[in-house]
């Protein structure tokens, strides 16, 4: 397995990090994370397909790009992979052809032959597609308990629309996936939050999908007015700084759900994923040091305690809310991950509108918010 990293800025591709793959014709896979403007750039698409004609290409818009220990804006981070012993298969569907995101997720996983399938990497539209329904649908078709990880595309802090593409110019509503086959590919994942929870446990008493109307039989909007104060109607995405810890019915662990908006017309809070009635919830707040520690913990967990673990590639997908909180210090959470791996490991990723991975690194994949989620790849 050989990995090349490129940075696309000012209409040119520059090798960043690892050296160029000796034979571009042997490249199997391209992963491109970039600003909406650049991933939809026909020149970039042409440059990549001309340079690596045999490679499958997945492109995804972001809320910031990650390359090694740096975070970029208005760029495209391109990772080119040449597998020596691993087979890949790709699939892509658009929400337009389905009744809901659950059915899309089910159908997407059914595109893959389960025999020899080790893991699947998912890149999804981050606004039109319901991430929690997508994850549930994928797991409904996950016959072999295959590891599924990935993330939801971003649009900076604008939240207008997001783009994903497979071997074509990216567009809205798309979910793309790549499956990895064979015994020679070692894929691992880890997802850690680092947010503090506070206050009593409460129960969601009225909700519909992502819309929460009542908590403890009290208006969720009124309750959040006490919590958020003037931020309740803030137009600068400050609500992203106040996620909700959610324990779904029948589950033992909390997951985070970001607030996307407040609907005074419907008198409800709108979250980034489904929160069913009967869910136990607690308020959350950011702790700068714990966010950084969480990124470090994610890197440590993925090694399984092996201090010599040095994967060829690490994909980092972190939430846009974390980026807003960390501000100018955002590279610190990327840096602690980079410090944990050796120079052998190529690091790429993006800031997302949601992360997809198992809960506590075991079991079915779920939609997460406010986490640092790492997926590593290594041929053995």
Task: Please place each PLM-identified region on the residue numbering.
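Short beta-strand/loop segments at the ligand-binding rim of alpha/beta enzyme cores
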Residues: 344
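Small-residue-enriched flexible segments
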Residues: 1-51, 55-56, 60-327, 331-340, ...
């Amino acid at each position: 397995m050989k990995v090349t990293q490129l940075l696309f800025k000012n209409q040119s591709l520059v090798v960043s990090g690892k050296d160029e793959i000796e034979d571009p014709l042997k490249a199997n896979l391209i992963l491109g994370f970039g600003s909406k403007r650049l991933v939809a750039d026909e020149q970039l698409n042409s440059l990549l397909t001309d340079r690596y004609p045999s490679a499958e290409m997945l492109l995804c818009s972001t809320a910031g790009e990650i390359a090694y220990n740096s975070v970029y804006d208005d760029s495209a981070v391109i990772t080119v992979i040449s597998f020596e012993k691993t087979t890949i298969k790709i699939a892509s569907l658009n929400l337009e052809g389905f009744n809901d995101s659950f059915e899309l997720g089910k159908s997407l996983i059914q595109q893959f032959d389960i025999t020899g399938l080790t893991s699947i990497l998912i890149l999804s539209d981050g606004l039109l597609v319901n991430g929690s329904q997508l994850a549930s649908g994928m797991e409904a078709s996950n016959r072999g308990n295959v590891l599924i990880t990935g993330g939801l595309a971003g649009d900076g802090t604008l939240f207008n629309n997001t783009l994903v593409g497979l071997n074509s110019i990216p567009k809205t509503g798309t979910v793309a996936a790549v499956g990895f086959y064979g015994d020679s590919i070692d894929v691992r994942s880890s997802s850690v939050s680092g947010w503090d929870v506070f206050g009593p446990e409460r129960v969601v008493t009225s909700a519909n999908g992502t819309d929460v109307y009542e908590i403890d039989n009290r208006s969720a909007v009124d309750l959040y007015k006490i919590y958020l104060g003037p931020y309740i109607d803030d137009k600068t995405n400050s609500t992203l700084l106040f996620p909700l810890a959610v324990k779904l019915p029948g589950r033992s662990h909390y997951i985070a759900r970001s607030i996307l908006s407040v609907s005074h017309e419907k008198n409800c809070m709108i979250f980034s994923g489904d929160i069913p009635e009967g869910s136990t919830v607690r308020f959350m707040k950011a702790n700068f040091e714990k966010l950084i520690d969480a990124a470090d913990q994610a890197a440590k967990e993925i090694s399984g305690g092996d201090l010599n673990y040095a994967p060829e590639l690490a994909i980092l997908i972190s939430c846009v809310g974390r980026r807003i909180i960390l501000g100018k210090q955002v590279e610190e959470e990327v840096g602690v991950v980079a410090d944990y791996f050796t120079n052998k490991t190529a690091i790429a990723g993006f800031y997302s509108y949601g992360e997809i991975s198992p809960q506590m690194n075991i079991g079915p994949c779920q939609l997460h918010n406010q986490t640092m989620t790492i997926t590593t790849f290594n041929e053995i």
